[in-house]
Amino acid sequence: MSIPEVGKKIRVTVPSTTANLGPGFDCLGAALDLYNEFIFTRIEGGGDRFDLIMESTDGNHLRGGPENLVFRAAQKVWENANIDPFALEARVKLAVPPARGLGSSATAIVAGLIGANAIMNSPLSKEKLLELAIDIEGHPDNVVPSLLGGLCLTARSSSQRWRIIRCDWHYSIKAVVAIPAIRLSTSEARKVMPKNVPISDAVTNMGALTLLLNGLKAGNAELIKEGMFDKLHEPYRWKLIKGGLEVKDAALNAGALGCAISGAGPSILALCKEENGKNVSQAMVKAWENSGVASRAPFLNVQTTGSQFSTISGK
């Protein structure tokens, strides 16, 4: 396979994600309509050159060297396609804030995989890209919906293969995501979790996840209320989020059906009917303000098409 000509450009648009949704720890996630955009250009030079150009002052978490997630993902494509690495420039327009529990690292991984693959006319299948994305991230709950879109449940089968189920999300259920002006790294959020949990907590979570998925499919408010809670990770993580429990209580009191930490946090996801959305959003922002934390709480629709790419031009 030939290396693409210098000047070839590919645009990749990758949605943010909210993972876990309460009981779906490390297996459930949904794509949201907040996006990072990446433009990849084949430039002069060898595979040790990777230029990263940011178009956001909030993008300093993405580094431009070989340790960068975009570059690491591109390298995986080259390795699996048996291609000699070549120089790439990635121009990134960031809208997904880093370290907020909205899958910013997943957007970098997915963009690197899709961009490097597309610029070579896609030698790797989408299934292979999914496998590589999960391998790089270490868990599937963000990268799978980021690549495929929608609400995705991903689990290892008895044969140790990853199985992905696209789950239904009823149109009447809306998402409000309260995004604070504070950061929390995934590694920090994982450190506080115990290595073992009581079997009763695991059983409770399995039941809650079943209720939640059926509630989201049918738009059944009662099932969502009864299913959107967690025993495996949230009891240990709330203490890391300043004012988080107060924000959750405010959302529920304002009419939210359920409330959960988005991914590793600190953002908080609330599900509600459309008529309650404005009150829920305002209540969450106000509760964080009372704790001395600035925030915003936009409506974010579930994005169903996943990551998209297009060729911009040649030289």
UniProtKB/Swiss-Prot annotation:
Protein's UniProt keywords contain Nucleotide-binding: yes
Gene Ontology molecular-function annotations: ATP binding; homoserine kinase activity
Coarse class of the protein's main subcellular location: cytoplasm
Subcellular location: Cytoplasm
EC code: 2.7.1.39
Reactions catalysed, as given in the entry: L-homoserine + ATP = O-phospho-L-homoserine + ADP + H(+)
Binding residues annotated for ATP, in chain numbering: 97-107
ATP-binding among keywords: yes
Keywords for this protein: Amino-acid biosynthesis, ATP-binding, Cytoplasm, Kinase, Nucleotide-binding, Threonine biosynthesis, Transferase
Name of the top EC class for this enzyme: transferase
A Pfam match: GHMP_kinases_C
Domain of life: Bacteria
One Gene Ontology term from the biological process aspect of the record: threonine biosynthetic process
Pathway: Amino-acid biosynthesis; L-threonine biosynthesis; L-threonine from L-aspartate: step 4/5
InterPro entries: GHMP_kinase_C_dom, GHMP_kinase_C_sf, GHMP_kinase_N_dom, GHMP_knse_ATP-bd_CS, Homoserine_kinase, Ribosomal_Su5_D2-typ_SF, Ribsml_uS5_D2-typ_fold_subgr
Gene Ontology, cellular component aspect: cytoplasm
PANTHER family xref list: HOMOSERINE KINASE, HOMOSERINE/4-DIPHOSPHOCYTIDYL-2-C-METHYL-D-ERYTHRITOL KINASE
Role played: Catalyzes the ATP-dependent phosphorylation of L-homoserine to L-homoserine phosphate.
Family membership noted in the UniProt record: Belongs to the GHMP kinase family. Homoserine kinase subfamily.
Entry protein name: Homoserine kinase
Species name: Prochlorococcus marinus (strain MIT 9215)
